[in-house]
Amino acid sequence: MEQMKIQPEDWKEDYKEFDEATEKFYKGEMDAKTYKGISGGFGSYAQRGGNASMLRLRMSGGVMDLAKLKFIADAIETYHIKRVHLTTCQTLQFHDLDEATVKTLAVEALKCGIVTRGGGGDFPRNVTVSPLSGIEKGEYFNVLPWALAAADYLMTYIKGPKLPRKLKVGFSNTPANLTHATFRDLGFAAREDGTFDVYSAGGLGNNPAFGVKVAEKVEKDQILYYIEAMHQMFLAYGNYENRAKARSRYMQQTLGGAEKYKEAFWEKLKEVREMGKNLTLTLPEAEVGCEAEAGCDASTAVFTNSGRNRVYTQKQPGLYSVHCHPVGGTPDPSLFVNLYKAICEIPGAELRLCPDESFYVINCREEDLEAVLHVTEDSAKTIFEESVACIGAHVCQPVSYTHLTLPTTERV
C-alpha cells in the first residue's frame, strides 16, 4: 500500500468537542477529572490550579520544518506566550494559555500540519525517531520515512476502539538507540543489513521492562503488519480494569513471561496477515533518500574552538547540524522567533527535536553557522545543565509519587 497521508484539516471537526469541553471547564460547569478525560485526547491539559492550559504540539519524528517553526514563532509573538517546553517524546508544549488561546491555537496548528489530536490520553502518542536520521554519518539507514508512514497509520487508531493506555512507538537508526526503541511499547531498531529488529511491550515507570524481541530482520515495508499486531495485542490483553497496570509492559506478566508473550504476538501477526488487508508499504524513492556509504564514520563535532563543538558534520558534503540543549528543556520562547529569522532563507533547514529535550538545526551551510550558533548560544554548558526535566509540579498536575520518595532515598 502507498503511504497513508493524514490531512490535518480532516481533524478540524473533532475540535468542536474540545472547544465545548474547554468552555464548560473554564465556566466551572465541568470538573477537572472529566475535562482531563476529554482534553487529553486533544493534546491539552489544565495546569495546576485550573486557571491555565498546556497545549502539546505533535511533531512526528521530532521534525519541525520551517512552516511549523513559523507557526510557533508567530504564536509566541501574537499570543505573548511566556513558557514553552521540549518533551522526551520529541514534541513542544505551549504553557500558561488562557481559554481562548488554547482553543484557537489547537485549530490554527492544523494549517501548518500540526495535529494535537492524540497528544495525550489513551491514544498512540508521537512517534519518536533518532533525531539525525537521514543525515547522520554511520547510520544503518534512514529510518525517518518509515517512521513517518507509521505515524500516519497510527493516527487511524484514534477513532477506533479505546486502548487501555497510551501507546508509544519508536525508531532508532544506530546502536546508540537514542529513542530507546528496545524498551518502548513498540520499537523498531535498525540493523546493518537494512532491516529492523522489533521489540514489544517494554517501558519505564513502575515495574520497568525491556521490550520482548518479537522479530528479527523485518523488512522495512512490513512494519505496518507489526504495528497492527501490536494494536490487536493491546486490545486483547491490555488491562482495562486497573490503570496502574494498563501499560503494555504488564502484558508480559499477564501472558506468562517473554516467551509466552512472543508466541501470542506471533499469533496476532498471523491473524493480521490472514485478514487480507494489504499493509505492505510503498514509499516514493525521493522520500526514502540515498543511504550513507558503508563504513562511513559517525558524525563528529567540528570547529571545537570558541564553543563550536556544538556543530556536527552531516553525511551530505558541505552541510552541518548545530546542537542546542536548553537548560531543563525550557528555553526562552524568543529563541524560536529568532531561530526562524536566522534560518528561514536556508534551503532545507529545519529543527529536529531530541528525546533528551534538546534539538538540532540541520542542513546548515558553513556560512550559516555563525548566525545559528549565536542564536542558540544559551545552550547547556555542562552535563548537569543537560539533565532531563519535566515542566515541574508547580505547573502541571502530576500523578503523586511521594510514596516512592523514602524508599528511593534510602537506596541512594
Task: Specify the residue positions occupied by each region the protein language model found.
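Hydrophobic or amphipathic alpha-helical targeting/insertion segments
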Residues: L92-N126
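Short amphipathic alpha-helix segments
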Residues: V63-T78, G329-I346
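Mobile "lid/hinge" segments at catalytic clefts and subdomain interfaces of large enzymes
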Residues: V169-Y250
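A common structural junction motif
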Residues: I76-I81, L110-R117, I346-P347, T376-T382
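Active-site cavity-forming subdomains of large catalytic enzyme subunits
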Residues: P131, E136-S200
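Conserved small/polar residues in nucleotide/adenosyl-binding loops
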Residues: T402-T408
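Short glycine-/aliphatic-rich beta-strand segments at the starts of folded cytosolic domains
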Residues: G43-G62, Y312-G329
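Terminal amphipathic helices with adjacent charged low-complexity linkers/tails
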Residues: N239-C296
